Amino acid sequence: MKFAIPVIIVVLVAGGYAVNYFTGTVNAQPGECLTVSEFSKTADEPTRVDCGSQEANVKIGARVDGDAACPDGDYDTISMSGRMSYKLCLTVNAKQGDCLSGFLSDTAGYKKVACTDPAKDAELVKVTDTVDKAVCEGTEARYAQSYSTPPTTLCIKADK
């Protein structure tokens, strides 16, 4: 019994590390997607998810060390500190025709919703693989967001 408790502790610690390794951001790379519930210092750590899932609200555009700047663009950012300090430069993970709630919030994570949902506050009316906000001219978009890595421009119609 004396040896059982240390073994259980080691198993629990190793299990927790493995869960964080495979679902946390410590090894997250550009092109992978995350669920971010809130953009604040007190929010839960993002979770890696399949980019095709409904919960995948952001995609990692770039990962930079420490306090380095993100590439040119309108990235949301999450900074992680500790043994490994890094910043994730995040793009909205949505396609043309998708609707979102939380887009107009300063801290809420985006949530993909039905375009008929009363919580909807934004709709992506055009998405291109270029970095040119001028592509949004002539659309219903009130906001244009562009990212240099990967090259993307989002034309967003906001409801409020």
Feature locations, PLM:
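Primary mode marks residue(s) on the alpha4-beta5-alpha5 output face of response regulator receiver
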Residues: 2-5, 15-160
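Glycine-rich ThDP/TPP pyrophosphate-binding loop and its adjacent helix/strand module
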Residues: 8-11
